[in-house]
């Protein structure tokens, strides 16, 4: 098991921020999620809210922390213990994407920047297996690591006021899908017809941190057919269990 050099710092009167090395890395993400599970089990009788990101955990207690150093000492001990954590059940989700011009509104610009054809960009984007590193800034927005280096491109200096629901986009070293219509500054290359956040479901977002996402290309006709199934409430996204 990898142990990293962590930093622990107070974050307001009721929270502690735990930080790993500042980089996007699957081994760090795995360690973050492992420690999160340990803390959730340790505090099962205490109402503690734990938020995870790429390389950090924010631990929010239900009371003011009286002695921050005692709390941090406990956290350090728990982290270093070889705790028995059940293997997490992770899944790979197969997500359909239509890259037609009607959806991929930034593809023309990216072909010039990358010196690649549209078909080459689509192939590079759809052949990678992505890891869900973080879910935010909108509910159901999956920040995905694993984008081919040839497709890395900065976000727009001036964000669009309106990005369509399902827009598949590139921002820096990552790719992601806008779960709902919203402002956004990522570069849009396609659209997925499925729901990434559905409040009518017991679990609104089908994916969790650590899961994998594989995109596959569909035609506009296939896109419309899938969208009709989604709207009818009968579409089932394909997935498979992978090692956690």
List PLM regions with ranges.
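Glycine-rich active-site loops that engage anionic ligands at enzyme catalytic sites
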Residues: 1-244
